[in-house]
């Protein structure tokens, strides 16, 4: 059965900032041309499509934000399932079919867990790479990525250059080291349970020991 709702996340891996899960409900003919996995789109194209998706009368959009404190306090797999369920609950109707981009190595298990966590009686399927193969999931990936990028821009305005937020980003690592050196800890926008933060703490402790 053709899905009526697509769900995807953005920002699962970064050490800085929130994760966002978006759900999009629409008849496929209502979706604008050019929908694709958000990672394949230029920033300008992604934002133009996100604006059209948010503004269209026949398209319903829901976004769930998982803040760093929530991520630090929870199991990431459990939180991802709960956020997908909350997002689809925001737009779906009972009896409808939902397709998620699988957030687990076992796509079937992920679908079953999301269905169990949802308050609505919906049929949930999950596929790896669905953001590139299904237009509704692609639309959800665009909305989620747009929300994440706007969030990172706001963090940069508040804290200065934070980079992309990913652990491999030199700007992000420099931001984390400087914040820890100056404050003795990390600001609320940081996922302090990430191994990147643990390494920075360990480096600082070793530096202190070397000073004796």
Curated annotation (Swiss-Prot):
It comes from Natronomonas pharaonis (strain ATCC 35678 / DSM 2160 / CIP 103997 / JCM 8858 / NBRC 14720 / NCIMB 2260 / Gabara) (Halobacterium pharaonis). It catalyses: Endonucleolytic cleavage to 5'-phosphomonoester. GO terms for cellular component: cytoplasm; ribonuclease H2 complex. It is found in: Cytoplasm. Its cofactor is Mn(2+); Mg(2+). Its EC number is 3.1.26.4. Manganese or magnesium. Binds 1 divalent metal ion per monomer in the absence of substrate. May bind a second metal ion after substrate binding. Keywords: Cytoplasm, Endonuclease, Hydrolase, Manganese, Metal-binding, Nuclease. This is Ribonuclease HII. Residues 2-206 form the RNase H type-2 domain. HAMAP family: RNase_HII_A. Gene3D superfamilies: Ribonuclease H-like superfamily/Ribonuclease H, Ribonuclease hii. Domain 2. Transmembrane segments: none annotated. SUPFAM superfamilies: Ribonuclease H-like. Belongs to the RNase HII family.
């Amino acid at each position: 059965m053709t899905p009526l709702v697509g769900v995807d996340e953005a920002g699962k891996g970064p050490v800085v900032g929130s994760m966002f899960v978006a759900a999009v409900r629409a008849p496929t003919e209502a979706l604008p041309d050019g929908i694709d996995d958000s990672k394949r789109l230029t920033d300008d194209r992604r934002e133009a499509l996100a604006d059209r998706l948010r503004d269209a009368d026949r398209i319903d959009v829901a976004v769930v934000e998982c803040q760093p404190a929530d991520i630090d306090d929870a199991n990431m797999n459990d939180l991802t399932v709960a956020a997908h369920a909350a997002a689809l609950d925001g737009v779906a109707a009972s009896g409808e079919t939902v397709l998620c981009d699988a957030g687990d190595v076992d796509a079937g298990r992920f679908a079953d867990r999301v269905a169990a966590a949802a308050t609505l009686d919906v049929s949930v399927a999950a596929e790896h790479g669905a953001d590139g193969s299904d237009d509704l999931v692609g639309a959800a990936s665009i909305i989620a990525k747009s929300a994440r990028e706007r969030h990172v821009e706001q963090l940069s305005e508040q804290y200065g250059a934070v980079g992309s937020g990913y652990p491999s980003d030199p700007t992000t690592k420099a931001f984390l080291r400087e914040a820890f050196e100056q404050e003795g800890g990390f600001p609320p926008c940081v996922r302090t349970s990430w191994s990147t933060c643990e390494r920075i703490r360990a480096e600082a402790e070793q530096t202190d020991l070397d000073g004796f």
